[in-house]
């Protein structure tokens, strides 16, 4: 299917350009030349000899044959002799040849070592085995690995064979893998829902297969639980939805004192939710949020520092700050909170 503008070009396909140019007058040809110059000022499509316009309107005074001119210039160049050098080149070398200086070879002179008479007598009367043991203590490995010394010890009286340099290493202590977390997830969840007084600490660390809905149920059950004081879910693949659920729990819970969510997949959004929830919590004294999959960023760290400066109950905060400013502010805030606790304890002891 032809486009509308293509249909209009069909009639120009069979036009003879030479016939059209032959019908144009000199003025029309000049106008056409000016139009072409405007379209292509550099005349990149023309040979170099035709790009410049004629600078005069005068007629030529004689015939011009380009081939004849080139032949004449080539003939003149071959017939003209080269100019001789004013100073002919003789190949003579001038100056001195560079010879690098040889560095003197340093020869080491062995120093004569004089021993005490008692040591000389002891070494003179020592057996080969004693000398071998002494070399091992002093670290003289050349003597220990010398085959000539082995032959001498073999030929000695009372020796059954050569003494080899066998160094016995210490036995490697077996490093056993940590046993899996023995916590029964379902049983702990049911105890929390039943508000069991015997359950005061829940440790779910390193249990990788806990579903996200189950972790949310733990957070939901903590809202009404009045006995659990320490809850830890480090390295459980928890993410932002879990962090948001625990943030809602912190706004309601009045018993929990320690929360650990380290080594998880929580981003800055989840951490900020937990930090904001601490403004409405009066019982939590310890929270750990370090070693997440991605860095929290400067903005989140500044929010954490501002919250801790306004919170007088957090005594332990587990996070390694990347910036000096928030780190200094948080350290000062935690120190201030611990000083307040110490002052209250001292005042209570005085009473």
Swiss-Prot record:
Q: Which parts of the chain span the membrane according to its record?
A: none
Gene Ontology terms describing biological process: learning or memory; neuron-neuron synaptic transmission; pointed-end actin filament capping; positive regulation of G protein-coupled receptor signaling pathway
Superkingdom, natural source: Eukaryota
Enumerate the Gene3D superfamilies for this protein. Answer: Ribonuclease Inhibitor (3.80.10.10)
Stored InterPro entries: LRR_dom_sf, TMOD
**Where are the Phosphoserine residues found in this chain?**
25
Q: Where in the cell is it found?
A: Cytoplasm, Cytoskeleton
What cellular component terms from Gene Ontology apply here? cytoplasm; cytoskeleton; synapse
Swiss-Prot/TrEMBL keywords:
Actin-binding, Cytoplasm, Cytoskeleton, Phosphoprotein
Among Pfam families, the record links this protein to: Tropomodulin
Gene Ontology MF terms in the entry: actin binding; tropomyosin binding
Reported tissue expression: Neuronal-tissue specific.
The entry assigns this protein to a family as follows: Belongs to the tropomodulin family.
Subunit text? Binds to the N-terminus of tropomyosin and to actin.
Role description:
Blocks the elongation and depolymerization of the actin filaments at the pointed end. The Tmod/TM complex contributes to the formation of the short actin protofilament, which in turn defines the geometry of the membrane skeleton.
Protein's name according to its UniProt entry: Tropomodulin-2
What organism does this protein naturally occur in?
Answer: Mus musculus
| Lineage, top ranks | Eukaryota, Metazoa, Chordata, Craniata, Vertebrata
């Amino acid at each position: 299917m032809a486009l509308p503008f293509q249909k209009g070009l069909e009639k120009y396909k069979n036009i003879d350009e030479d016939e059209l140019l032959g019908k144009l007058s000199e003025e029309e040809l000049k106008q056409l030349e000016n139009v072409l110059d405007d379209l292509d000022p550099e005349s990149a499509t023309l040979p170099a000899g035709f790009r410049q316009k004629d600078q005069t309107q005068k007629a030529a005074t004689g015939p011009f044959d380009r081939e004849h001119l080139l032949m004449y210039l080539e003939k003149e160049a071959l017939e003209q002799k080269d100019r001789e050098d004013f100073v002919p080149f003789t190949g003579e070398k001038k100056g001195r040849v560079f010879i690098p200086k040889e560095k003197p070879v340093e020869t080491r002179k062995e120093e004569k070592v004089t021993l005490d008479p008692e040591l000389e007598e002891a070494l003179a009367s020592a057996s080969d085995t004693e000398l071998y043991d002494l070399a091992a203590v002093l670290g003289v490995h050349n003597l220990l690995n010398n085959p000539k010394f082995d032959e001498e010890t073999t030929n000695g009286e009372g020796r059954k064979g050569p003494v080899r340099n066998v160094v016995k290493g210490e036995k490697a202590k077996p490093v056993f893998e940590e046993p899996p977390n023995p916590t029964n997830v379902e049983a702990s969840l049911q105890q929390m829902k039943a508000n069991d007084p015997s359950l005061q600490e829940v440790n779910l660390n390193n249990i990788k297969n806990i579903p996200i809905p189950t972790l949310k149920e733990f957070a939901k059950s903590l809202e009404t639980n009045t006995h659990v004081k320490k809850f830890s879910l480090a390295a459980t693949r928890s993410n932002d939805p879990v962090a948001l659920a625990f943030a809602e729990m912190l706004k309601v819970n009045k018993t929990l004192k320690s929360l650990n969510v380290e080594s998880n997949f929580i981003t800055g959004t989840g951490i900020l939710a937990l930090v904001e929830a601490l403004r409405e919590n009066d019982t939590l004294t310890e929270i750990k949020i370090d070693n997440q999959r991605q860095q929290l960023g400067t903005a989140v760290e500044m929010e954490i520092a501002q919250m801790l400066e306004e919170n007088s109950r957090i005594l332990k905060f587990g996070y390694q700050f990347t910036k000096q400013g928030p780190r200094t502010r948080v350290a000062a805030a935690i120190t201030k909170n611990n000083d307040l606790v110490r002052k209250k304890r001292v005042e209570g002891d005085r009473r």
